[in-house]
Amino acid sequence: MSGQEDWESEIDNPPACVPNLSNSEPAFKASNQNYFSSNNAFNRTTERGFGNRKASDDCNQNFEFSERGFGKQRAGSDANQNFESSERGFGNRRGKGRGGFGTFGKDSNGKQESGDFTNDDNRTIDDNRRRGGFQRRGGFNDETSGRGRRGVRGGTSFSGFGREDGNEQSGFTSNDGFNNETSGFGSGRRGSRGDSSFSGDRESDRGRGFGRGGFRGRNEDIGVESGKGQEGFERSEQGPRVTYIPPPPPAEESDIFKHYQTGINFDKYDDIVVEVSGSDVPPAILTFEEANLCDSLAKNVCKSGYVKLTPIQKHSIPIIVAGRDLMACAQTGSGKTAAFLLPILAHLMVKGVESSAFQTLKEPEAIIVAPTRELINQIYLDARKFSYGTCVRPVVIYGGTQMFHSLKQISEGCNILCATPGRLLDVIRKEKIGLTKLRYLVLDEADRMLDMGFREDIENLLKSSGMPSKEERQTLMFSATFPSSIQSLAREILKPDYLFVVVGQVGGACSDVEQMVIEVDEFGKKDKLMEILQEIGSERTMVFVKTKKKADFIATFLCQEKVPSTSIHGDREQKERETALRDFRTGQCPVIVATSVAARGLDIENVSYVINFDIPDDIDEYVHRIGRTGRCGNTGRAISFFDKRGDDEQRIARSLVKVLSDAHQEVPAWLEEVAFSAHGSSAYNPRSNKFASTDDRKRGDSRGDYSTSGFSPSAAQAEEEDWG
């Protein structure tokens, strides 16, 4: 055809003359590096580039680098192509790369295309796997969806605004963020350090924290093992970085020492039976004067409204002052926090503190660990109250808050460190605190930490560098329940001659709580809850449910029914959790719906009712839940919904009957029938094997001379009754 272009002929017969570009210079020359190497080597590292990668191994390709050039392509045969890429330029990539704003590249098999529409092995471009990026030497097309075709001189750089994976995905970079193998914008091997910083949609490529990369080069590490950068930002694996800074604690003295009055039943504590087992037991004290507190501490105790010692305080304070390890078990709301804080503070104030704000490495003398953020913050407020106006500085750190804030608090001086296990291990790994001067290690709610997911954290804490051995430190463990299995674990932490204090009925519910069990099926619980709340009115009520989703659902349902409510559970952000507790404490929301996160140790003023919307399958959890009311001699009521067909109800039935009987509460006849039918079934977990009523060392394991104080044989016999 004369005068017309023969496209078929041009495609089948490539031009005989190929321009020689070997003498071309790059756009920006920033180093003396040889741009045209002939040794067919692959340079696998880039520094701060916009995504330079090696070519596919299918052909003998040669990548050459300039430090700041834009890079360009050299001419050559299909089987031996040479590429230049820039270490700081708009990187050149191989087929499966995830690099920069593409200049001349390759297709997914490492073969260069020789025409607009076909490559050398005569496959159409639509058959190739496509990536997003600036392609065809300037056009922007998403090849994944088949839009656009590659240009004559190479393919795309497989990045820019796109993702790899062979399907269309969005995002500015292809590998989930700005950083990958060599940081810069995009680029890098999958699985390299700091896999993703500003994560996109792909779960498999998500990294933790800022990682290595982001806005820095390969060797400029700003990430740490637990996903928290040195700048103090925490990042979850799927969420944004944590920037929440909790509000400062109250500064006014009247707010610091604000307290609620003890109830009319507080004097009944004098009648509670106490057992202390072990050798050489220090005698109990009866008044605060006998504790020999320094003047400043004694004044703060008085300002806090403490007039009379509780049973756990009478026995624990002299034991701790004597330097003995202690495992103390007392019912909820009986003053366990003051029982370990007062002797620790008294010792630090008399002997003097060693940690100073002027030291680079802060070394606290006491570390207090609790399983929940709310509980550890409460312990801190008590420590701050008792140490007010003294040389002792308590600090609290916990997850869900900005790491930088935690480190800042520590840097200002730290004598008593209150922490949750995870955040404590983080600051130890960062070497922000030292442990060589540690005198006291306190585990509050110790049974939960050893038995419910925190055991590994506690073991890692005890193995931390600088941690004194158990012979060199004083270890104190407190809880409302100490099952036998936990006692066996605790003996690995405590000295062999530790003392065991039992107050009242171990694992039993507080006698100041009126307990009621109501038979109701699953579908009638909401109506029954509304009926009870309408009768209660504006009295402060905690509603416990089993799942996080149900907590939000019930709270929303109550709000729709014009009952001001809020919720608290582990999936809520720390700011939301603290706001919920504040609204509940102030009475803005008289009803709070919670999971077990709020069942441990929280001391909220004037909680009149606890409602178990979902009864727990573990009797320990039941005891802790109802212990949110009836505290410090105040009376309270606990109402539990019981669905006889529920699995959890079957598991707890017989243990629940015993708890009710021990607390002199009425046991419904139908509940006794359920408990009897559950006897011997797989759903029944015998309470006698779960609860420890006395020191396990007394059960045939005689490793010392054990004495008892205030011990009632008849009471112990009842507690040890075998329900199995």
Curated annotation (Swiss-Prot):
Composition bias (Acidic residues) maps to: 1-11
Task: Choose any GO biological process term that the UniProt entry carries and state it.
Answer: piRNA processing
Annotated stretches, region: Disordered: 1-25, 37-241, 683-724
Query: The motif Q motif: which residues?
Result: 286-314
Q: Which residues form the Helicase C-terminal domain?
A: 512-675
Highest taxon of the lineage: Eukaryota
Is Nucleotide-binding found in the keyword set?
yes
Q: Which reaction does it catalyse?
A: ATP + H2O = ADP + phosphate + H(+)
Cite a GO CC annotation: pi-body
Q: Where does ATP bind?
A: 330-337
| Swiss-Prot/TrEMBL keywords | ATP-binding, Cytoplasm, Developmental protein, Differentiation, Helicase, Hydrolase, Meiosis, Nucleotide-binding, Oogenesis, Repeat, RNA-mediated gene silencing, Spermatogenesis
Boundaries of each Helicase ATP-binding domain copy? 317-500
Q: What class of enzyme is it?
A: hydrolase
What's the EC number here?
3.6.4.13
| Stated role | Probable ATP-dependent RNA helicase required during spermatogenesis to repress transposable elements and preventing their mobilization, which is essential for the germline integrity. Acts via the piRNA metabolic process, which mediates the repression of transposable elements during meiosis by forming complexes composed of piRNAs and Piwi proteins and governs the methylation and subsequent repression of transposons. Involved in the secondary piRNAs metabolic process, the production of piRNAs in fetal male germ cells through a ping-pong amplification cycle.
Q: What is this protein called?
A: Probable ATP-dependent RNA helicase DDX4
Gene name of this polypeptide: ddx4
